[in-house]
């Protein structure tokens, strides 16, 4: 298939699917209370699908060892929950269909740009195999920097010639784990759409739909959700780390790899009750001491990066490790 990814002028990497589909990949991103591994695919029709592996290192399960994070995989298809109505007087809503991904950008978030079309329903309409695109969608997936939440923002724009009504349902998907399997009782894993209702889009207009994937202890109240604020915070973090310890070589690929390595090392720090602790990740290594990964590799790097939370995590790792020496 050749080289898929190119370096974006803004510092990320971008892939524009062509004749190199289907293609699948995975990527991990982390915040202080959540890590997620996105397993995604662009299929042979050009549609995007994603499975989210949600890891909550502070919600402990049995046996309470160093791998005891609450984990759950969720493949909820958010765009499939939306519907489009083109009737001026009635309500004959159609599901979004015929997605075609234009590009995917990875730069501290995962952004998927695609176009959608649909077949209208009701008398007088007939099925068309390749209807013209009427909606453009930019979905942005990222972890909350501080909360146990994976955030998804869907920016939807009317690129057609007629007024569209976007129907956003009230939606929540809840799993409650058995209390005897959690160290502090049962846990609630919740997927939800925010701000349900009808949005009217004139040609050229756009709207935002937000989704959250969160977890908490049974009986615990989750804080109010503000995906826009979470996205700004995530972007500020990525920008701050990118501006530190900048590598400049004759090879832009090496420079970009180093920038991504900085972001990954700095983001993957869990705020445990014992202080900040670096997490190697991989759906396995969180909220504990990992002597090689911390003491030998990442701890000496954080002072050179000039990242305060990284420095604090390094000191915590050494303090905890010293108790066993």
Give the ranges of each region predicted by the language model.
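Terminal accessory carbohydrate-recognition/targeting modules of carbohydrate-active enzymes
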Residues: 1-256, 303-310
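Substrate-binding groove/exosite segments of carbohydrate-active enzymes
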Residues: 239-325
